[in-house]
């Protein structure tokens, strides 16, 4: 399949590998697209797995609705459910990086029956992130999330500056060039920035307001992840710090692996062998 539809929107998807193989859904982050996984998928295909890597809402040219509500986490999760339905898959292994990681956590939380295994790259569980915003330096690291709430200004400022930002962040040159080129289109830039104007930023803000509440690890918390889960994190990630990374395990009530790499944020592009190895390790149990 090359595309699928949901609610009048058309999503592009890269469907590759053995058709009879178990399916792995790969969810990209900001400001990436399906090509973020291009160095990861060869190892998965060689292991007999089928991969489906969509260009998500805001990134597919046919799926760029306007308005904050169109980018709420419920919509983003339902887009992935629609992909599974279109591919006639009752379940799949799910892998997500950056914002795609946020969607992967939420999918496993809301629809565990559709997720065989979960591998999240870089992004901590959202409740761990909310806790870390109240402790340590995560709030400082996440200042840009508030700045990106401004209407239109971030798009206009970043259109000519994104390449330099991505280079300085450690993204490989070819990937930085490709992502920045797409961002020069105002529609593409607006679609990508709309992720920051929806959820889960409101949930994080709510976490800040609930400063005085504590969740006891002695009692199961609601919405814990119940599927086998691996979380990969780079200790040199400038945006996502250690407190949230280490606290993520509290929100997984199934087999859990935490893999710390001596790396930064762009793990699919910079550390594809490590990512594919951990995906395969999780898929194989």
Per-segment meaning from a language model:
Residues 1-24, 46-49, 89-90, 253, ...:
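Alpha/beta-hydrolase fold catalytic core
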Residues 3, 51-53, 231, 258-260:
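Conserved beta-strand scaffold positions in the cores of enzyme catalytic domains, especially
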Residues 7, 17, 55, 122, ...:
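Residues at the C-termini of beta-strands that transition into short coil/loop
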Residues 9-11, 23, 36, 59-90, ...:
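Flexible "cap/lid" subdomain of the alpha/beta-hydrolase fold that forms the substrate-access gate
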Residues 14-63:
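Conserved HGGG/HGGXW glycine-rich cap/lid loop of the alpha/beta-hydrolase fold
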Residues 40, 107, 278-282:
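Hydrophobic residues on the short alpha-helix immediately C-terminal to a glycine-rich phosphate/catalytic loop
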Residues 80, 84, 275, 279, ...:
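Hydrophobic "lid"/C-terminal helical patch
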Residues 263-272:
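Catalytic histidine-centered segment of alpha/beta-hydrolase-like enzymes
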């Amino acid at each position: 399949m090359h595309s699928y539809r949901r609610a009048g929107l058309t999503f592009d998807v890269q469907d590759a590998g053995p058709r009879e193989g178990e399916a792995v859904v790969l969810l990209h982050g900001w400001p990436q697209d399906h090509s973020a996984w291009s160095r990861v998928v060869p190892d998965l295909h060689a292991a007999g797995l089928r991969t489906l890597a969509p260009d998500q809402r805001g990134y597919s040219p046919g799926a760029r609705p306007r308005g904050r509500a169109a980018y709420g986490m419920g919509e983003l999760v339902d887009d992935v459910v629609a992909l599974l339905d279109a591919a006639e898959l009752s379940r799949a292994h799910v892998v997500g990086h950056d914002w795609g990681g946020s969607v992967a956590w939420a999918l496993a939380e809301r629809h565990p029956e559709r997720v065989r295994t979960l591998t999240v790259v870089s992004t901590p569980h959202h409740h761990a992130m909310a806790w870390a915003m109240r402790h340590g330096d995560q709030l400082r690291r996440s200042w840009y999330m508030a700045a990106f709430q401004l209407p239109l200004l971030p798009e206009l400022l970043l259109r000519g500056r994104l390449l330099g930002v991505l280079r300085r962040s450690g993204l490989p040159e070819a990937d930085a060039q490709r992502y920045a080129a797409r961002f020069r289109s105002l529609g593409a830039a607006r679609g990508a920035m709309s992720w920051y104007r929806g959820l889960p930023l409101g949930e994080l803000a709510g976490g800040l307001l609930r400063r005085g509440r504590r969740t006891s690890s002695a009692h199961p918390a609601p919405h814990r992840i119940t599927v086998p889960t691996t979380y990969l994190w780079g200790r040199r990630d400038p945006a996502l710090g250690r407190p949230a990374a280490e606290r993520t395990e509290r929100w997984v009530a199934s087999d859990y692996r935490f893999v710390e790499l001596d790396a930064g944020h762009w793990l699919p592009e910079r550390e594809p062998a490590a990512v594919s190895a951990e995906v395969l390790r999780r898929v194989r149990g």
